Amino acid sequence: MKITREQVEHVARLARLELSEAELDTFTGQMDSILSYVEKLNALDTEGIVPTSHAVPMENAFRADEATGSIGVEAALANAPLRAQSFFRVPKVIE
């Protein structure tokens, strides 16, 4: 499957990218190379090959989740420049 310059322009528009003429030429060639490689991979006989979801065995390296005590509301808000009841008050950032 050969990718066309028009297809690269279409993908760039979808991604909201503005590409120069040189970039369009470069990316057309690069995407064509990638698709050629994928076609080679698709042609391989993978019958009887077990799918691999992870190359190495997965282990949970994190500790067990245990509840512990924490500081109180007043201590947490002690240095807050603005507060509203028992919450931090921050400037409005979205209109």
Curated annotation (Swiss-Prot):
InterPro entries referenced in this protein's UniProt entry, alphabetically: Asp/Glu-ADT_sf_sub_c, GatC
E.C. numbers: 6.3.5.-
Pfam families linked: GatC
Keyword Nucleotide-binding among record annotations: yes
GO molecular function, one term: asparaginyl-tRNA synthase (glutamine-hydrolyzing) activity
Secretion signal, residue range per the UniProt entry: none
Keywords (A to Z) from UniProt: ATP-binding, Ligase, Nucleotide-binding, Protein biosynthesis
Catalyzed reactions per annotation: L-glutamyl-tRNA(Gln) + L-glutamine + ATP + H2O = L-glutaminyl-tRNA(Gln) + L-glutamate + ADP + phosphate + H(+); L-aspartyl-tRNA(Asn) + L-glutamine + ATP + H2O = L-asparaginyl-tRNA(Asn) + L-glutamate + ADP + phosphate + 2 H(+)
Record carries keyword Nucleotide-binding: yes
Example GO BP: regulation of translational fidelity
Subunit note: Heterotrimer of A, B and C subunits.
Known role: Allows the formation of correctly charged Asn-tRNA(Asn) or Gln-tRNA(Gln) through the transamidation of misacylated Asp-tRNA(Asn) or Glu-tRNA(Gln) in organisms which lack either or both of asparaginyl-tRNA or glutaminyl-tRNA synthetases. The reaction takes place in the presence of glutamine and ATP through an activated phospho-Asp-tRNA(Asn) or phospho-Glu-tRNA(Gln).
Family (UniProt): Belongs to the GatC family.
Protein name per Swiss-Prot or TrEMBL: Aspartyl/glutamyl-tRNA(Asn/Gln) amidotransferase subunit C
The species this protein was found in: Citrifermentans bemidjiense (strain ATCC BAA-1014 / DSM 16622 / JCM 12645 / Bem) (Geobacter bemidjiensis)
Source lineage: Bacteria, Pseudomonadati, Thermodesulfobacteriota, Desulfuromonadia, Geobacterales
Protein encoded by which gene: gatC
